[in-house]
Amino acid sequence: ECDVLERFKVKHQWQTVFSEAHRTEFSLHFWKEFLHDHPSLVELFTRVNGANIYSPEFQAHGIRVLAGLDSVIGVLDEIPTLTVQLAHLKAQHTERGTKPEYFDLFGKHLASHLGDELGTHFDYAAFRDCYDFIASGIKP
C-alpha cells in the first residue's frame, strides 16, 4: 500500500534517525543486533570483514547499505525516480544472488530498531507498508 501519508511519515521518521549526525551510530547498532540474531549471515559479508563490525570496511559497507535505503525512502513520493532506483537495486541484488527472505529479516530488524529509536513516535504500520513496497521492488 504505502499511501501518500505513509510515505510522508516514513520519510520524516527515517530522516530523524538517519540524519548525518546519527548515521554511523545508527548503522553500528543496527548491524550489531542484526548479525547477533542471524550469525549465519555473517558469511555474506566476508568481503567487507563482516566478522568484525567495528572494522572500517564493514562500517563503510553497513552505511552504504542503509544509504541505499535512504536514497529510496527519499524518493518515495517521486514515482518515476523511485521506479528507476528500485530497478537498479533489484539488478544489483539479483546479480549478487541475494535471497528474497533476507529482505524480510532485514525489514523486521530495521522496524524493531526504528521503534527503539523513535519510541511512541514510530508509525510501525506506515513503515511496514512502505518497506514491503520497497522490498517487493528490490527482491530478486
Curated annotation (Swiss-Prot):
Complex and partners: The giant hemoglobins of worms are formed of a monomeric subunit and a disulfide-bonded trimer. This subunit is monomeric.
Disulphide bonds in the chain: 2-130
Record bears the keyword Heme: yes
Protein name: Extracellular globin-1
Pfam family, one: Globin
InterPro entries xrefs: Globin, Globin-like_sf, Globin/Proto, Haemoglobin_extracell, Mb-like_M
Residues reported in the UniProt entry to bind heme b: 93
Coiled-coil blocks: none
GO molecular-function terms, A-Z: heme binding; iron ion binding; oxygen binding; oxygen carrier activity
Native species: Metaphire hilgendorfi (Earthworm)
Residue span, Globin domain: 1-140
Subcellular location: Secreted
Similarity-based family: Belongs to the globin family.
Broad class of the protein's primary localization: secreted
Gene Ontology, cellular component aspect: extracellular region; hemoglobin complex
